[in-house]
């Protein structure tokens, strides 16, 4: 039962501030569905907003994040519920620079997972975590003055990136500012 639909409509136009975070350095954000937290991170600290308790806190890392969050890209892995930060493009192609690291909030520590690289930086790409196949998939984005139309995936067992080959069918054109959605009944991404 909706008692006052006019009030609900007007309330939906405004946002109520519940927390505020800022960083002097590059940062990223993600939702941790396992802990019901919003995490906002940079290289030296993580800011956490808990949706259950409605409290926020800042935690300085024991040692700085080994990955430079240039694009601020991350995901929370359901296999271990850790926050993974990834930046697989390295300006000079050096493969000894960490490009993926996992943060464990229980002991406030980082673990380097990969130094694997991709050929270009993918600004505004979309991503999907394939729990069944244990792969993190990215698509689209742009970098080096070109749009990306390829799928790349990272195997979450050995943390190696690879370019994926797609089955024949409709051509997928390069794009950015995209989103991906998974259909479990069809085992397909849209």
Residues covered by each model-derived region:
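Kelch-like beta-propeller repeat domains
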Residues: 2-190
């Amino acid at each position: 039962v909706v008692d006052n639909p006019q009030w609900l409509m007007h309330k939906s136009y405004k946002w109520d501030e519940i927390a505020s975070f800022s960083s002097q350095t590059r940062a990223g954000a993600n939702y941790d569905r396992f802990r019901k937290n919003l995490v906002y991170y940079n290289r030296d600290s993580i800011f956490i907003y808990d949706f259950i308790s409605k409290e926020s806190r800042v935690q300085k890392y024991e040692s700085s994040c080994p990955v430079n969050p240039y694009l601020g890209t991350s995901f929370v892995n359901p296999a271990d519920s850790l926050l993974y930060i990834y930046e697989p493009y390295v300006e000079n192609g050096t493969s000894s620079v960490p490009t993926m690291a996992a943060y464990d909030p229980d002991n406030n520590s980082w673990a380097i997972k990969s130094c694997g690289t991709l050929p270009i930086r993918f600004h505004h790409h979309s991503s999907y975590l394939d729990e069944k196949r244990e792969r993190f998939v990215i698509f689209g984005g742009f970098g080096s003055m070109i749009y990306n139309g390829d799928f790349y995936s990272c195997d979450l067992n050995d943390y190696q990136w690879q370019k994926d080959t797609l089955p024949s069918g409709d051509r997928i054109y390069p794009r950015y500012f995209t989103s991906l959605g998974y259909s479990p009944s069809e085992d397909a991404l849209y």
